[in-house]
């Protein structure tokens, strides 16, 4: 049974039927579809469009279908065009002809737009929850490992930071991601139900009522836009892509830091895998997969942008292609956030190797230049002097702090005994604005 066909002389080909069906993926929307129908039916009786006893039968049937799906009694499968026809046809089979009144004053165009918005809201809230859990772990692990480590530019050791402060940089990225998602929730918080196919309805339906019942701030202002808007899907996948970019950057650093060349951290066994041929291997596959899946979410974004780029108003069947990219991007970002939280919460940090890398990288060179500036030398001259000292140290295979005062004075008479305290790593990280890094 189809929800349409009266104006057709010939049957739809089986090839076209299969090609047209979206049930295999839009079945994810069964909960939202039924909840939207429940709200619609309650509105219909309030507006005296259907009778009270009809409403009761329809609501009971919808609630039974929802329960049967949740309990696995009713399988979402079969020869149905989409989740909307699956629910409606099963309702009619369950309660009889009164079920045919469910769709009064409604189109599948506003129905699917509603389903997707409800699903997008729920999905976004789930992503925000996962972000918060990851941010909590970053703070906790950072506070437990507030060790001095090299900070990098161009992947070259640059200045001293702390492991905690480095993790907090990612905390800031994810905090921005959370703000972006909350802003997106506010923008999409308008109900399209009641927009009809594109031009509303001749029935005096109450869009304000259904919007409130379904948790929306208000109904959409324009029917055409209500059924054809997919901006919120594009916006959310775009924001998911930024989250994935942040996760990928963090993954890259974790992969580097866990390598034998760095040995700053150990990734827990629970988030690593081995080699089928090399018994000694412990691979950071969790982080590598997150890094790889970032491109997958980018692909979802480009896919939906391409679908929407040339569509005239209002609804077009092209828009059926909005669901799989969104479902995939949402599932991917949630799984990656959960895995990253697991990786972070089980990290082991090698304090000694962090400090060894600090000692080898002339990470107090900027502070040594600042010392000369404080003694009256122009910064550009101080920069040159310290650069010459670094060359001298490299030739001697020593650090700046290992040079004697006599050696330092070969480069400038401004050096005094207090230079050693000034360029001490633990001391320098608590000078000036560096105190904001919170080393303790």
Swiss-Prot record:
Catalytic activity: 2-(N(omega)-L-arginino)succinate = fumarate + L-arginine
GO BP terms, alphabetized: arginine biosynthetic process via ornithine; L-arginine biosynthetic process
EC primary class: lyase
Enzyme Commission number(s): 4.3.2.1
Principal cellular location given in the protein's record: cytoplasm
Localization terms from the record: Cytoplasm
Record bears the keyword Cell membrane: no
Domain of life: Bacteria
InterPro entries: Arg_succ_lyase_C, Argininosuccinate_lyase, Fumarase/histidase_N, Fumarate_lyase_CS, Fumarate_lyase_fam, Fumarate_lyase_N, L-Aspartase-like
GO molecular function annotations of the record: argininosuccinate lyase activity
One GO CC term on file: cytosol
Pfam families per the UniProt record, alphabetical: ASL_C2 (PF14698), Lyase_1 (PF00206)
Keyword annotations: Amino-acid biosynthesis, Arginine biosynthesis, Cytoplasm, Lyase
Presence of the UniProt keyword Phosphoprotein in the record: no
Pathway named in the protein's UniProt entry: Amino-acid biosynthesis; L-arginine biosynthesis; L-arginine from L-ornithine and carbamoyl phosphate: step 3/3
Family note: Belongs to the lyase 1 family. Argininosuccinate lyase subfamily.
Name of the molecule in the record: Argininosuccinate lyase
Organism from which the protein derives: Clostridium botulinum (strain Langeland / NCTC 10281 / Type F)
Lineage: Bacteria, Bacillati, Bacillota, Clostridia, Eubacteriales
């Amino acid at each position: 049974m189809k929800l349409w066909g009266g104006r057709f002389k010939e049957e739809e080909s089986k090839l076209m039927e299969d090609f047209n069906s979206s049930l295999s993926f839009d079945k994810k929307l069964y909960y939202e579809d039924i909840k939207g129908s429940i709200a619609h039916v309650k509105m219909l009786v309030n507006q005296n469009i259907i009778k009270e006893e009809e409403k009761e039968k329809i609501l009971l049937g919808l609630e039974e279908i929802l329960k049967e799906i949740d309990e696995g009694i009713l399988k979402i499968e079969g020869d149905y065009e989409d989740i909307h026809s699956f629910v409606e046809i099963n309702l009619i089979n369950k309660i009889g002809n009164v079920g045919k009144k469910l769709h009064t004053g409604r189109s599948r165009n506003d129905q699917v737009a509603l389903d997707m918005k409800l699903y997008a809201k729920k999905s976004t809230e789930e992503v925000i929850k996962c972000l918060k859990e990851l941010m909590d772990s970053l703070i906790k692990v950072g506070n437990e490992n507030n060790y001095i480590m090299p900070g990098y530019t161009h992947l070259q050791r640059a200045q001293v930071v702390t492991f905690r402060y480095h993790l907090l940089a990612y905390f800031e990225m994810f905090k921005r991601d959370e703000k972006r998602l909350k802003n997106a929730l506010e923008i999409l918080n308008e109900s399209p139900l009641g927009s009809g196919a594109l031009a509303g309805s001749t029935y005096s339906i109450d869009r304000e009522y259904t919007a409130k019942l379904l948790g929306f701030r208000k109904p959409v202002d324009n029917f055409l836009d209500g059924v054809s808007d997919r901006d919120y899907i594009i916006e959310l996948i775009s924001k998911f892509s930024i989250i994935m970019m942040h996760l990928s950057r963090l993954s890259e650093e974790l992969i580097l830091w866990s390598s034998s060349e760095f040995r700053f951290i150990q990734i827990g066994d629970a988030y690593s895998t081995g080699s089928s041929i090399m018994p000694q291997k412990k691979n950071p596959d969790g982080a590598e997969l997150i890094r790889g899946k970032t491109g997958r979410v980018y692909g979802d974004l480009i896919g939906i942008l391409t679908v929407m780029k040339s569509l005239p108003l209002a609804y077009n069947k092209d828009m059926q292609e909005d669901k799989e990219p969104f479902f995939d991007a949402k599932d991917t970002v949630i799984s990656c956030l959960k895995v990253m939280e697991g990786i972070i919460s089980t990290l082991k940090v090698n304090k000694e190797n962090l400090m060894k890398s600090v000692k080898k990288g002339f990470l107090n060179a900027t502070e040594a230049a600042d010392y000369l500036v404080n003694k009256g030398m122009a910064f550009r001259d101080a920069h040159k002097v310290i650069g010459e000292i670094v060359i001298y140290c490299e030739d001697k295979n020593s650090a700046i702090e290992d040079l004697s005062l006599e050696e330092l004075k070969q480069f400038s008479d401004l050096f005094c005994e207090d230079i050693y305290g000034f360029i001490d790593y633990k001391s320098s990280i608590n000078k000036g604005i560096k105190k904001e890094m919170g080393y303790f």
